[in-house]
């Protein structure tokens, strides 16, 4: 079972699951928030959130180590091993708390 912490929500799970599905198909690719938003809201219909919301959540997931960010100007992301471990229920809630808590 996945741990729940106050800063996480269903949008975070959907974003991580999207990246994990790509990886399970053999594609560990970097994506910016726009293609994640288009696919999650229009193609897959798993989210009803704005592109800005998806972008903010991806920044937060990267800050917490669940996504990895490259290219600081354009913001491309991919799932990390920690993100995969979260989806597999292999992390404790303490592993997901911000460093100051």
Describe every region a protein language model picked out.
Residues 1-28:
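Short alpha-helical segments that sit at the start of domains
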Residues 12-16, 49, 58, 77:
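A broad helix-preferring feature
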Residues 26-42, 47:
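Short acidic, hydrophobic short linear motifs in intrinsically disordered regions
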Residues 47-63:
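Short amphipathic alpha-helical interaction segments
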Residues 62-71:
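A short, conserved structural fragment
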Residues 74-80:
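Minor-groove-contacting beta-hairpin "wing" of winged helix-turn-helix DNA-binding domains
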Residues 82-101:
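Short, amphipathic alpha-helical interaction segments positioned at domain boundaries
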């Amino acid at each position: 079972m996945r741990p729940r912490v106050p800063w996480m929500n269903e949008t975070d799970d959907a974003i991580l699951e999207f990246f994990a599905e790509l990886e399970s198909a053999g594609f560990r690719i970097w994506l910016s928030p726009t293609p994640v938003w288009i696919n999650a809201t229009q193609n897959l219909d798993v989210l009803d959130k704005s592109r800005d919301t998806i972008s903010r959540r991806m920044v937060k997931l990267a800050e917490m180590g669940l996504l990895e960010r490259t290219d600081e100007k354009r913001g491309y992301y991919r799932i990390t091993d920690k993100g995969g471990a979260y989806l597999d229920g292999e992390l404790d809630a303490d592993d997901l708390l911000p460093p100051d808590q």
